UniProtKB/Swiss-Prot annotation:
Specifically methylates the N7 position of a guanine in 16S rRNA. HAMAP family: 16SrRNA_methyltr_G (MF_00074). The keyword Methyltransferase applies. InterPro entries: rRNA_ssu_MeTfrase_G (IPR003682), SAM-dependent_MTases_sf (IPR029063). The keyword Methyltransferase applies. GO terms for cellular component: cytosol. Belongs to the methyltransferase superfamily. RNA methyltransferase RsmG family. Its main location: cytoplasm. It is found in: Cytoplasm. S-adenosyl-L-methionine binds at residues 95, 100, 146-147, 159. It comes from Parabacteroides distasonis (strain ATCC 8503 / DSM 20701 / CIP 104284 / JCM 5825 / NCTC 11152). Coiled coil: none annotated. Keywords: Cytoplasm, Methyltransferase, rRNA processing, S-adenosyl-L-methionine, Transferase. The gene is rsmG. This is Ribosomal RNA small subunit methyltransferase G.
Amino acid sequence: MIDKPINRCPMEQNTEKFSIPNSQFSILTSYFPDLTDRQKEQYAALYDLYTDWNAKINVISRKDIENLYPHHVLHSLGITDMLRFKPGSSVMDLGTGGGFPGIPLAILFPETHFHLVDSIGKKIKVGQAVAEAIGLENVSFRHCRGEEEKQLFDFVVSRAVMPLADLVKIVRKNIKKEQINALPNGLICLKGGELAHEILPFRNQAISMDLKDHFKEEFFETKKVVYVPL
């Protein structure tokens, strides 16, 4: 079990040393033009790190690794369409896999703590190694099932892990009562396809937003971000 902060690891301010395709990185910076040099450095490092780790432990479809930034990093940041976390917030990423959406969000919100949870230990190993390599100081990891995690958080985020009703059952226990953000504490998840039936039990509470309204790439045509207050 891994349940500890990541050690600091300083990085040089030079994105040119990474083999990231320029077209991919320009997609990211076009939507997030206010990134600091530090954040650009951290995002740029993800390409080589995930390419290397993915050859050993499959956390991203090997056919899709070339689309790391639009399909995984930018998609993770689609959470910001619903909410930008205030400093001091705490967020659990349930079913993080190799670190999505938690690691891209942790880079963007350095004053928010992200706790990344997954039931598959080797995937947690990848996420931890990536976080250590880029010097993320605001993340912790735990190898466990969501039902086993008892800590409290302002929000839980998730990316296409399971049906909405199942997610709500698991994470309701993890939501703090005290609120500091613009939205009441709850669940924010990234979903795809037709969600009318899935959202039906929460129709009086849930908010669903189409990512295609913010991101112009074809990949986002059917992608949504869904919020349920808990």
